[in-house]
């Protein structure tokens, strides 16, 4: 056993351990007071780097959620505005339907048109004023807008909102055969004209659609009325709707005289004696209408005294009479019927509720006037034109000049909006087209909103998991650290006692010197 005075090894060891224990106590107190296991890089260098990366990712995901919520807010603003526009369109259509009956006077139709014009102004006002943070939402400028929805660059969602102003929606394409089709009967007493098969090109942008053959004749269940039914049966595939008008009009007022051997559509009416000028007593009209259920043709007089024959079901109209009948009916007989062995087929109108062209071909389709050599009255209109006058181009393309031999675009228009029966029909088509366009825009916005909601749910879940991973690395385990602090506290107390004992041992040297 040796005793040294200059170097107290035991005391030095006790001191060194005590210093380390105090350092550990300080570290424990720092962790317990901050709640963090890593307070500085020295605590866990690699762990700190990972935790910092996770914290950055979590904060970025939080901002991404806020971005997505901003996008949803913008979409909801536009959606509610468009919902109001759709309500306006519903009201306009209801007023157009109200105007589309001849019980309305011209004055009442003008009142309805005035209401519609006000509604149109509000529709455009909504389109021009709906905005978010200074950005116009419904003007068409909100296109391919990107929203960052991830923690890393180029993780975006794109959103576009189409224009909803009246000049950008409600497009309809109208085409009407320029000539009211005229066919040659097999014989003066026959009724067969031809068979027509139509082929509509690129109805869906790519494919064509061929319709079944339809017989064009003066018999029931044939003619362009039957052809229109076939077209409308497949309107969902074609995107095209058909209307027709089969009318024969005298070229001049009815003159006095006797009509002998009158035959309409193969049904013999016989002789109508002593017809008065302008058929003032109605005997000619009554004679023709007495067999209208057999002929499918109804007669009336217009305000000029000309006789009008209208096909009730769209079959062709043929008229045969002897001798001076042409003088009675009006010189030159009926518009479009130049002889007793001819029949008027009528005029077919095709309407498409978008701006695409109507491309049609087929077998014998020239017999119904749809031939480039004959010419087709055609135009594209939009909802904005509802605020003004429907000009001659719209009137002709919509078949408004049905009682004319040729749908001449130089003829007069049909007035403003619903101020005419035909105009009211056009307004209904425009509104239907506008509704379809707005519903498509809303549907696209709804899809984006669903995507954003799903993204928010996913990001929120990811953010929670990232925060949990960061917490596992950065946050302190209070139970373990409290136990560690208690251990170090006890060690500090025992170390102080040990250091005191180590210093006391050196006093034994004095005993040796006594």
From Swiss-Prot:
Molecular function (Gene Ontology), one example: structural molecule activity
Domain of life: Bacteria
GO CC annotation, single: bacterial-type flagellum
Compartments (UniProt record): Secreted; Bacterial flagellum
Keywords on record: Bacterial flagellum, Secreted, Virulence
Main location as per UniProt: secreted
PANTHER family (alphabetical): FLAGELLIN
General function of this protein: Flagellin is the subunit protein which polymerizes to form the filaments of bacterial flagella. Important for motility and virulence.
Subunit note: Heteromer of FlaA and FlaB. FlaB is located proximal to the hook while the remainder of the filament is composed of the predominant FlaA.
Family, per entry: Belongs to the bacterial flagellin family.
Annotated protein name in UniProt: Flagellin B
